[in-house]
């Protein structure tokens, strides 16, 4: 701890043998020794709650982050979708989601092994992150399924985004992860826009129905939810 000529007291924050950072206190005039000592004691008191806050923040991050891909997981997705849906209702703004599934992923795992399958998931995640605009969010929905949240985006814009992602994955060689090219990697994507009275569960169901329509009718395509899809659904 030291005083510089510009009357700034620099206090290093330590706790539990960890360096947390530095607290700078600026004085209008040269401080007294008593003031310096008080600040030193105050810095010690600040360090422990700061350490606790950082640990809590890290625990929260871990609970909302998918460990394999590094993007947000289902827990974080549920919260983000609720907030986005509330905002869409309150401000009457467009809200769309994409449900993305890797075609024949079981065959990838069976042919190349689960470690290669994990690498594919990580590379696909990188493509999704590159495709995201500032307000977009990507989540791992589970297994080989991903969900993208597109706020202030109507159906046409969501379909355009879906096709950009699909084509990027179709032409991606995945950096030599696959030893052979007889197993092309493609995705099917379900697209759904929130209607006026839709809640989050209804929106997810629409995207899910669109996704499985795409998979039943050829795969490697992006399909927007419609009445035709609703009537084609096995549950209808």
Language model regions located:
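A short, aliphatic-rich beta-strand micro-motif
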Residues: 6-15
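A short pre-motif secondary-structure segment
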Residues: 137-140
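Conserved nucleotide-binding and Mg2+-coordinating catalytic segments in signaling enzymes
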Residues: 60-79, 100-114, 122
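Alpha-helical scaffold within the catalytic cores of cyclic-nucleotide enzymes
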Residues: 125-126, 157-175, 208
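Short catalytic/binding micro-motifs of nucleotide second-messenger systems
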Residues: 87, 130-135, 167-180, 211-213
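Catalytic-core segments of nucleotide cyclases and related cyclic-nucleotide turnover enzymes
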Residues: 159, 193-236
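Amphipathic alpha-helical "output/dimerization" segments
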Residues: 31-51
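Short regulatory alpha-helical coupling segments
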Residues: 61, 74-94, 125-133, 151
């Amino acid at each position: 701890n030291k005083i510089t000529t510009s009357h700034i007291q620099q206090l290093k924050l330590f706790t539990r043998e960890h360096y947390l950072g530095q607290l700078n206190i600026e004085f209008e005039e040269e401080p007294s020794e008593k003031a310096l000592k008080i600040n030193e004691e105050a810095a010690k008191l600040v360090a422990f709650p700061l350490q606790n806050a950082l640990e809590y923040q890290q625990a929260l991050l871990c609970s909302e982050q998918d460990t394999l891909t590094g993007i947000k997981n289902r827990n974080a997705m549920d919260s983000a979708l609720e907030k986005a849906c509330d905002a869409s209702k309150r401000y009457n703004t467009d809200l769309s989601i994409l449900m993305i599934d890797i075609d024949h992923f079981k065959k990838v795992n069976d042919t190349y092994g689960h470690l290669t399958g994990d690498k594919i998931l990580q590379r696909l995640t990188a493509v999704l992150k590159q495709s995201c605009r500032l307000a977009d969010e990507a989540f791992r929905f589970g297994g080989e399924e991903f969900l993208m949240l597109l706020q202030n985006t109507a159906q046409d814009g969501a379909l355009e985004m879906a096709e950009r992602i699909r084509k990027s994955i179709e032409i991606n060689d995945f950096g030599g992860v696959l030893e052979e090219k007889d197993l092309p990697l493609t995705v099917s994507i379900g697209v759904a826009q929130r209607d006026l009275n839709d809640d989050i569960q209804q929106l997810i169901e629409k995207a899910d129905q669109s996704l499985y329509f795409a998979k039943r009718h050829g795969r490697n395509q992006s399909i927007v939810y419609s009445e035709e899809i609703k009537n084609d659904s096995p549950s209808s």
